[in-house]
Amino acid sequence: MAGNTIGQLFRVTTFGESHGLALGCIVDGVPPGIPLTEADLQHDLDRRRPGTSRYTTQRREPDQVKILSGIFEGVTTGTSIGLLIENTDQRSQDYSAIKDVFRPGHADYTYEQKYGLRDYRGGGRSSARETAMRVAAGAIAKKYLAEKFGIEIRGCLTQMGDIPLEIKDWSQVEQNPFFCPDPDKIDALDELMRALKKEGDSIGAKVTVVASGVPAGLGEPVFDRLDADIAHALMSINAVKGVEIGDGFDVVALRGSQNRDEITKDGFQSNHAGGILGGISSGQQIIAHMALKPTSSITVPGRTINRFGEEVEMITKGRHDPCVGIRAVPIAEAMLAIVLMDHLLRQRAQNADVKTDIPRW
């Protein structure tokens, strides 16, 4: 299986399955001399981990990360950083009834077509459990970006089902189980989630991530545009079916006179482009959105086939999230951080001596 690595200079390679012994990753390209402990990574892992509220899967994994290499006397050495998280709450028996059945809407059918076999226990490698290691690696990038460049990366839920959420107050995001920035909508989200759990169904969501303090000049035209790499990273997250940068698909209804981000001596007058022009960061906030489908792991009966070609009706048993978008927030932050750190290192390697007299805001 290829495709387990992201990045060029800051490279993250993950391994492990949902019901295997452990998850792990190798992080290459971290500069030496950066103070780093397991506690630096644990905060974001705790935000992502399952079983933390009644609105998410009740699989209870502590997700305690172990640093295996690349750290000496509390600082990075510049060598590969190895990270490991043990799986401790597997219930593989929950999946024995579906070992020969393809769950509709899941990767069961496509994995079997590609490899001729699959790990049916919780989806194996296709499970969102894998993203725990992305969050751990992303926490390294977030720390580097914040301490060396003053870059802040934040994410939140901006829609659940047909409930839109305004970014009214970032401080509220960590104060509720939905990562919701709109305190006026908490009760509506709670009511929707209760209804979904009662019905045994699920719902989709929209997540927004914002990076502030990103310098102008990041991005490598033409095939490694910054927005292309961000879209690639976000699309790699489980259940994501669409990504927008800036105003995204809303620009279809705009005219050029409305959409262009005009510039005065005081700076940009708007940010429809989401902080990226021509594939290169403009120095404005980088804004990206991603749409996540409703999970197919539900108890509402549905039609499918088994590996023998027979039609069957099935429900998905086990412990699942009614809305996978909730726990996707720290994952999206991590993926954005990984991309930005990679491009910062690439910019430093090629253009460290570039100086311009063009204003920066």
Curated annotation (Swiss-Prot):
Single GO molecular function: FMN binding
Pathway(s): Metabolic intermediate biosynthesis; chorismate biosynthesis; chorismate from D-erythrose 4-phosphate and phosphoenolpyruvate: step 7/7
Binding positions (NADP(+)): 48, 54
Named cofactor requirement(s): FMNH2
EC number from the UniProt entry: 4.2.3.5
Leading EC class: lyase
Alphabetized SUPFAM superfamilies for the sequence: Chorismate synthase, AroC
Cofactor: record remark: Reduced FMN (FMNH(2)).
Reaction equations catalysed: 5-O-(1-carboxyvinyl)-3-phosphoshikimate = chorismate + phosphate
PROSITE patterns: CHORISMATE_SYNTHASE_1, CHORISMATE_SYNTHASE_2, CHORISMATE_SYNTHASE_3
Annotated residues for binding of FMN: 125-127, 238-239, 278, 293-297, 319
Assembly mode: Homotetramer.
Function: This reaction introduces a second double bond into the aromatic ring system.
Family: Belongs to the chorismate synthase family.
The protein, known as: Chorismate synthase
Source organism of this protein record: Escherichia coli O7:K1 (strain IAI39 / ExPEC)
Gene behind the chain: aroC
